Amino acid sequence: MDTILNERTWKKFLIMDIFLMRNGFYNTKPQESDNGDIPFIGASAVNNGITSWHTLEDIEAAPKAGNADKKVGRNQNINQKIFDGNCICVTNNGSVGYAHYQENRFTCSHDVNPLYANPKMKWRMNKYNALFLCGIIEQERFRWAYGRKWRPSRMKESVISLPVDVTGNPDWEFMENYSKGIMEEEKQRLLQLNI
């Protein structure tokens, strides 16, 4: 599959041209729940960024900062704490530069920036092109560290290289098909192992 990548024409794009970036929510981590169905995405390199699970009620009750009983930190509207799925979450602190595709709604810390498809680029994010983009974004990880955070202002100005079509636009179809091919190869490999 590497040969296929090497045969492509690549072009540099600003992250802010490809994505609409949202800031994560600066909140205290909600009380963890045994029956929670909403993931909390934190500055983690593992488990798709998920550090815990919560109910909507847990998230709604968690204040922006401090202790709710002491009225330190004003609680925010639930709509500011919940993010739509179908996006890529990039860690900007802690395990800096990891990118995780989130298919469903979630909540996250301010150590994470959710990236959504920029409609000006006329593309729709899906699981396959998002997984390709996660790999591309993670190629930038070496530039950042705990002491040099990839905060939103830096992230927006960061450049990534993408395969392009004959018109010089990102080749979304190629990215999607490439990821599907990798997943099919892995599926076949696992089937041969009888796992």
What are the language-model segments listed below?
Residues M1-Y26, Q31-G49, V166-I195:
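Non-catalytic DNA-recognition/assembly elements of restriction-modification systems
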Residues D17-V159:
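DNA target-recognition domains and sequence-specific DNA-contacting regions of bacterial/archaeal
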